[in-house]
């Protein structure tokens, strides 16, 4: 695994002490994340735990997606996953309801990451 000197995206945002990222920086980071997820999906790999803790900053703010521990390879025969895995703040409604889910759940998580990049907080907060 490549060493990412910038650490994870969550820590990077925390180190900024609640200072918002510029719009250009948000897009620069987010587009790279989307390209990485697109690549995974093109190989039929669903990450299933996309979050700022699993996105890393390499040299020159280049993005790397890590922690593939719960990733799943989907196929035409098995086009859905059913195990409830991931981090609650980033889970799609299908996963929360323990329904079958597919790549669209990663897209939901991407939306949560984008919200966090823009607002420096999770889109949904609850005690349980």
Identify the residue ranges that each predicted region occupies:
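Conserved short submotifs of the Hanks-type protein kinase catalytic core
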Residues: 2-8
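AlphaC helix of the protein kinase catalytic domain
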Residues: 10-20
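Activation segment signature within eukaryotic-like protein kinase domains
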Residues: 29-30
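Protein kinase catalytic-loop region centered on the HRD/HxD motif
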Residues: 35-45
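Conserved catalytic-loop aspartate of Hanks-type protein kinases
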Residues: 106
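Structural helix C-cap motif within protein kinase domains
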Residues: 119-122
